């Protein structure tokens, strides 16, 4: 009964609104930076701390030698997936091997800073993956195909196909044409012409989640877990918009930090 209630609550959360809403303000013109809050411009407020895209002025620290596979054990991931109902489509889709394979394209993930920093980044990413997918139950957003995720302002650069849907898919629930386009280009698939690839190829599915993470979340990871919430779905959740959902994400993060044996750090909410 408890698990069913959790799945119902997750389903409601997935239906409530589009994912990655803060990213709607990114996709800036050449020469402009996308700020940590998702707005385009120049200067330190846009290109400094938390800058997500463009000619950012804040340099990233060099990669460390921490090994993700040693931190992300089979027991850790299976402990999450095992909480999904047996009938969930994602239960037999998402695997540790697929995630590790996707990591070959994003070797800096979880490898900046100390081992504790690596553990916190992995805990943060999987807290969001857990929340977005209901413990890896869902591959696609519930009723997502019935929603319009074609952003008119970016349609010239990322043209939508009338026969395709750009609703939430994969661990991060990648959404919108302006995300599918560049995610496809970065990961060698046709994001605009074949967005369903994210639902059909588990390695690509994880790659798109890692792409989004490295593009939009990694730049703010040193500001605390709350900043990662803002980077993923801040417009719908932060600043009092949905404190229950924020707390749910924080609870997952706190639990995964506990499992990995690392302190959560400060600034957990947004």
Curated annotation (Swiss-Prot):
Keyword set includes Hydrolase: yes
GO molecular function: chitin binding; endochitinase activity
Keyword Signal set for record: yes
Gene3D superfamilies, per the entry: 1.10.530.10, Endochitinase, domain 2, Endochitinase-like
Domain of life: Eukaryota
Family annotation (InterPro entries): Chitin-bd_1, Chitin-binding_1_CS, Endochitinase-like_sf, Glyco_hydro_19, Glyco_hydro_19_cat, Lysozyme-like_dom_sf
Pfam family, one: Chitin_bind_1
Signal peptide (from-to): 1-23
Enzyme Commission no: 3.2.1.14
Active site residues per record: 132 (proton donor)
Catalytic activity as recorded in UniProt: Random endo-hydrolysis of N-acetyl-beta-D-glucosaminide (1->4)-beta-linkages in chitin and chitodextrins
GO BP: cell wall macromolecule catabolic process; chitin catabolic process; defense response; polysaccharide catabolic process
Boundaries of every Chitin-binding type-1 domain copy: 24-58
Disulphide connectivity of cysteines: 26-34, 28-40, 33-47, 51-56, 88-137, 150-160, 238-270
Assigned keywords, A-Z: Carbohydrate metabolism, Chitin degradation, Chitin-binding, Disulfide bond, Glycosidase, Hydrolase, Plant defense, Polysaccharide degradation, Signal
Family, as annotated: Belongs to the glycosyl hydrolase 19 family. Chitinase class I subfamily.
Reported function: Defense against chitin-containing fungal pathogens.
PANTHER family noted in UniProt: CHITINASE-RELATED (PTHR22595), ENDOCHITINASE EP3 (PTHR22595:SF193)
This protein's name: Endochitinase PR4
Source organism per UniProt: Phaseolus vulgaris (Kidney bean)
Lineage: Eukaryota, Viridiplantae, Streptophyta, Embryophyta, Tracheophyta
The gene coding this protein: CHI4
């Amino acid at each position: 009964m408890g698990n069913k209630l959790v799945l119902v609550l997750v389903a409601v959360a997935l239906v409530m609104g589009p994912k990655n809403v803060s990213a709607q303000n990114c996709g800036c013109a050449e020469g402009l930076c996308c700020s940590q809050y998702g707005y385009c411009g120049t200067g330190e407020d846009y290109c400094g701390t938390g800058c997500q895209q463009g000619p950012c002025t804040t340099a990233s620290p060099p990669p460390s030698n921490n090994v993700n596979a040693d931190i992300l054990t089979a027991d850790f991931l299976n402990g999450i997936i095992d909480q999904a109902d047996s009938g969930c489509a994602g239960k037999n889709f998402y695997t540790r091997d697929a995630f590790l394979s996707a990591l070959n394209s994003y070797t800096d993930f979880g490898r900046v800073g100390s081992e504790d920093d690596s553990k916190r980044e992995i805990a943060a990413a999987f807290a969001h993956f857990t929340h977005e997918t209901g413990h890896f139950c869902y591959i696609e957003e519930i009723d997502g195909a019935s929603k319009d995720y074609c952003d008119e302002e970016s349609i010239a650069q990322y043209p939508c196909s009338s026969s395709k849907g750009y609703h939430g898919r994969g661990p991060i629930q990648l959404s919108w044409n302006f995300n599918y386009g560049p995610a496809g280009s970065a990961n060698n698939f046709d994001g605009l012409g074949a967005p369903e690839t994210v639902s059909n190829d588990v390695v690509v599915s994880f790659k798109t989640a890692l792409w989004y993470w490295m593009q939009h979340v990694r730049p703010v990871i040193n500001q605390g877990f709350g900043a990662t919430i803002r980077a993923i779905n801040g417009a719908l959740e932060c600043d009092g918009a949905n404190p229950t959902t924020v707390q749910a994400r924080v609870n997952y993060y706190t639990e995964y930090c506990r499992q990995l044996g690392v302190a959560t750090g400060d600034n957990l909410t947004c």
